Structures are given as structure tokens and as C-alpha cells.
Amino acid sequence: MADNGSRSTSAQTHQADTGLDDKNLLAMYRQMILCRTMDERIWMLNRQGKAAIVASAQGHEAAQIGSAWALRKGEDQFYIYYRDLAILLVLGMTPVEIMSGFLAKEGEPLSGARQFPTHGAYPEYGIINLSNVVATHVPQAVGAALAARMQSKDTVVITHFGDGASSMGDVHEAMNFAAVHKLPVIFFCENNKYAISVPLSKQMAVESVASRAQGYGMPGIEVDGCDIVAVYEATTEAANRARKGDGPTLIEARVERYLPHTSDDDDTLYRSREELEESRKRDPVKILADQLRQIDALSDDLDDEIHKEARQVVDEA
């Protein structure tokens, strides 16, 4: 049942295969630039001693935006993890609200700035309470999916986690229960190949996280997590399947982590400069920009304008 071939798409096929139009793709790009700009600024503020600990989303943006875009804002539920800055933006949180968490300012809506930045809950946007304890939110997502089923709602629940979390017992118990009861939940693994400093080869003996789905009787899809259209397509397929009552799906999005695990980590101790330079070749920002240019939806002037607007929004935040 596992579909372990890595999925990717081209600009020429995006409209026919996914239903996305140029307007949607450009809106995705704006969100991606805003997220990258904000992430870079937060990282800089941390280095200046002004912002709390940061788990950067750089390299993960396409996986986060593409998956969130495929679901229904305000209706479906999101159990995300500490690196999912872009999802917060897609769902409607403002840069001011998010920045207030990193700067411990009054008015931060997730937790009143009392938790790790980006942690807490925003029920109006379908964001359910985040925990910094790895993988504990995954069984909670399954419980929410069960509740939706019992209440005869067509809610789909998606839970995001990293490759390190995919080896935790909580995740496997959650996948087994969800598959047995055919619950409307999507397990979305953002695989950046490192559990803090532990490489994928030391985490699991199988070739992919997606291949584990077969053991639980659900589809497993491996997708290029730097290709936002491919991610959107895979998540849409999983959401449709869940809504029809066909049960859960495990999606493994292969992404890159451009910075240390967090601002408290030193990744030069376990990653070479050559490896980091190679990962930069799969920049989701550049990939989407190139796709937009191929279909004449992005000019140099418009690109400059989008970057300028993002910097202005972040400056004001």
C-alpha cells in the first residue's frame, strides 16, 4: 500500500493535475517569502540576545505551506510542531502576533508568551495546543479525529512532526489506532534527515518513513517537500481520502534544514560545509520562483516588490 516513489511536479502540469491556478501559486509564493523573511529576522534577533530560542523553518516552507493550503481554514484541525512557522502564517496568524511570542510581549495569542515560541493554541484557526515534548501531539490528533467521527463531522485532522518523532512510540500507537478505525487524519512527516544531530541512517533501518505505513495498513506517500505543488497534490489526495471515510495517510515530505536544529545547537559538529551547500540547491523559494517564471506569473519587478513588502511587514512587526 505504500507509494514510495518521490513525487514532484512541473509548472506545466500544475493546473491540470492539482487545480491550482496562477493566482494561488503566487499567493503561496508571497507566504513563502514572508515566512523566510520573518524567520531570518527572528534568527538575527536571537543572535542579538533579543529573541527566545528559535527552531528555524528555513528549507521547510514548501512542505508547510503546501500541506496547510490543501485543507480548510477554520474547519479542519492542525496539530503542528515547533518548526511550523509557515503554517501559522497560512492559517491567519499575523507577523505581529507571532513575533510577540519570540519577544515575550503582551498580547501573544497562543499562550500569552508563557510557552516556547509558536506553542499554545488558537482554536479559531484550528490550531490545537502544541507541546514541546516530541511526538505527544500525534495521539492527540488521532483523538480529535475520533471525536470528529463520533460527532458526524467531515473534519480532517493533520498532524505534522519531524523524522525524529517518527521513531517515537507515540507516533506508532497513533498510526495503528487511526488505521484500525479508519480515522480522518493525515500524518505529515517533515523529514529533514536529522533528529537534532542524529542522521536518518541511525534512526531507522528502512529507506523511508513512508514505507512504515504498509505495516499499519494505510497508504504511505513520499513527496519532494521542496516542491510546493507536489506537497499540495499529495495532501489534497490524503484529505479527500479521509473525508470519504477511507482512513488515514502517512505523507513523508523530504525537506532540507538550512540552519542548526535550534538556535542553541551547533550543527558544524555533525554536518560538513559541503553537505550544507548541497542542501541549499534544493531551496523551496527558488524552486517555486522558477516555476512561476516558467508560466510567466512572476517577473523580476514583481519579485522585488514581494520581497520589499515582506521586509516592510516584518519591520513593522
Where are these regions (language model features)?
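Conserved acidic/glycine
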Residues: M1-A63, W69, L259, D264-T268, ...
